[in-house]
């Protein structure tokens, strides 16, 4: 099959439009009935979501990414599972011109734990320009869905539990630079989703 690309320059180009846990959810969980801490709680939800995605290696809510590679391998693994869709694959040809690979010329595996892309049957990746970095760009959408309900309940519960823990111990927390230890309940909830490289 040839080589597999598992590393490259990954950039999130379109961020999620919602959080996996709503403000009303976390306020109910923490028994908060005022609005004084709303902005602070939203920051904690973001921090807890980032912790979940870092721990598991997964993307919770739909986001768009670009992965840049120095050439076409036999197969391209797309990080931040689950893979939702591949938007486009572009490359710099041997003449230095940007081109787009036809969707008919590659196949997408979004059923595997880590999404993959490879040439369609009896098709080949095109030649790229030598001596130039980042000649291939794969644009794709990752995440369980566009709504919180599409995210597995264990992941959402862990986000809620961690945000609540941070709120209850706010004197030790600086949003954006959280040093708090991940609670065991979060580890237990998230561990089945943790990506493990073999």
Segments from the language model and where they lie:
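Divalent metal-cofactor coordination and adjacent catalytic microenvironments
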Residues: 1-198
């Amino acid at each position: 099959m040839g080589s597999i690309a598992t590393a490259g320059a990954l950039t999130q180009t379109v961020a999620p439009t919602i959080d996996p846990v709503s403000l009303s959810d976390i306020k109910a969980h923490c028994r908060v009935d005022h609005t004084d801490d709303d902005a602070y709680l939203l920051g904690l939800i973001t921090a807890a979501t980032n912790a979940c995605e870092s721990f598991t290696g997964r993307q919770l809510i739909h986001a768009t990414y670009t992965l840049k590679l120095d050439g076409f391998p036999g197969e391209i693994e797309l990080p931040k599972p689950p893979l939702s869709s591949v938007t486009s694959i572009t490359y710099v040809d041997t003449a230095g011109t940007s081109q787009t690979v036809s969707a008919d010329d590659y196949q997408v595996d979004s059923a595997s734990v880590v999404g993959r892309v490879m040439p369609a049957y009896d098709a080949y990746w095109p030649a790229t320009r030598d001596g130039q970095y980042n000649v291939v760009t794969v644009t794709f959408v990752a995440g369980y869905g566009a709504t919180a309900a599409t995210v597995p309940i264990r992941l959402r519960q862990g986000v809620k539990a961690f945000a609540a823990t941070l709120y209850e111990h706010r004197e030790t927390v600086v949003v954006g630079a959280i040093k708090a230890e991940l609670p065991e309940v979060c580890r237990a909830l998230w561990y089945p989703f943790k990506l493990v490289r073999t």
